[in-house]
């Protein structure tokens, strides 16, 4: 099942939000030890098991949502079209994206769109791609790591001293001021 790891995390969050035990949720579906592995991303359940667990929690899995790649490209390039792209591709589908393989993408893009720049909870990190983790580190103010990870996945040009213009362009004024002074001396960016 595509996005099975993130499905396990979403199952765990929904189960804990309802204050359900693992044994109670998985009764008649799978063993509690197997559910534990699913929730940790250590086991890839069949689509049927995932669907049964999600259904019991009242959630509907969207297995093949429309790609959010245009939003990622607009965000990472610093394009002024990012807001319009987000409003077209993410906003109308927030509910279905929240229970899909693109749940982390939708939350990270929302953090930049809403200009709140709030990082995802740390429990999401083992399930993030390199690109997602690079943005997560930027949201956490861990700029050097964000640049290193972003360079590895070609999110932006490699720089040992400062992030690229695309990353800087997405920052709110408060986060921009948190950056090390040397990074804020990027040509064309007022300090």
Predicted region positions:
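Short alpha-helical DNA-recognition segment
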Residues: 18-37
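DNA major-groove recognition helix of helix-turn-helix/homeodomain DNA-binding modules
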Residues: 46-63
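"A position-specific structural signal for the A-helix of alpha-solenoid helical repeats
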Residues: 69-73, 102-109, 113, 128-136, ...
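Amphipathic alpha-helical segments of tetratricopeptide repeats
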Residues: 89-95, 122, 151-153, 178-189
């Amino acid at each position: 099942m595509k996005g099975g790891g993130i499905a396990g995390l979403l199952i765990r969050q929904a189960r804990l939000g309802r204050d359900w035990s693992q044994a109670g949720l998985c009764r008649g579906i799978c063993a509690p030890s197997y559910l534990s592995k699913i929730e940790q991303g250590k086991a890839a359940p069949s689509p049927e098991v995932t669907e049964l667990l999600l259904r019991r929690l009242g959630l509907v899995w969207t297995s093949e949502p429309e790609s959010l790649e245009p939003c990622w490209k607009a965000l990472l390039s610093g394009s002024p079209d990012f807001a319009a792209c987000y409003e077209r591709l993410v906003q109308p589908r927030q509910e279905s994206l929240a229970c899909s393989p693109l749940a982390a993408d939708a939350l990270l893009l929302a953090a930049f769109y809403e200009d709140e720049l709030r990082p995802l909870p740390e429990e999401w990190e083992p399930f993030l791609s390199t690109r997602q983790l690079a943005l997560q580190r930027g949201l956490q103010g861990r700029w050097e790591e964000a640049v290193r990870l972003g360079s590895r996945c070609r999110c932006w040009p490699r720089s040992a001293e400062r992030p690229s213009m695309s990353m800087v362009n997405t920052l709110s004024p408060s986060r921009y001021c948190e950056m090390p002074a040397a990074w804020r001396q990027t040509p064309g960016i007022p300090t």
